[in-house]
From Swiss-Prot:
Compartments, record wording: Cytoplasm
Protein name: Translational regulator CsrA
Higher taxonomy: Bacteria, Bacillati, Bacillota, Clostridia, Eubacteriales
UniProt keyword list: Bacterial flagellum biogenesis, Cytoplasm, Repressor, RNA-binding, Translation regulation
Subunit structure: Homodimer; the beta-strands of each monomer intercalate to form a hydrophobic core, while the alpha-helices form wings that extend away from the core.
BP-aspect Gene Ontology terms: bacterial-type flagellum organization; mRNA catabolic process; negative regulation of translational initiation; regulation of bacterial-type flagellum assembly; regulation of carbohydrate metabolic process
CC annotations in GO: cytosol
GO molecular function: mRNA 5'-UTR binding
Amino acid sequence: MLVITRKKGESLLIGDDIEITVVKLDDGSVKLAIDAPKNLTILRKELYNEVQEENKKATNFNPSILKNIKSK
């Protein structure tokens, strides 16, 4: 893991087309601006983890519950 120190207004580059800029520093939080291609999905890690967990739940389907459905 790379750890970088940045001040307000300073940026870092990832590859040729992603720039992350420190916009605001508050007590205990940092606001970042991310300039990246529109085709790139950017998610907060906690949201990503939530989506992954929901996907796991969705694949945990029990086909035996279909036996309770009556057909006409």
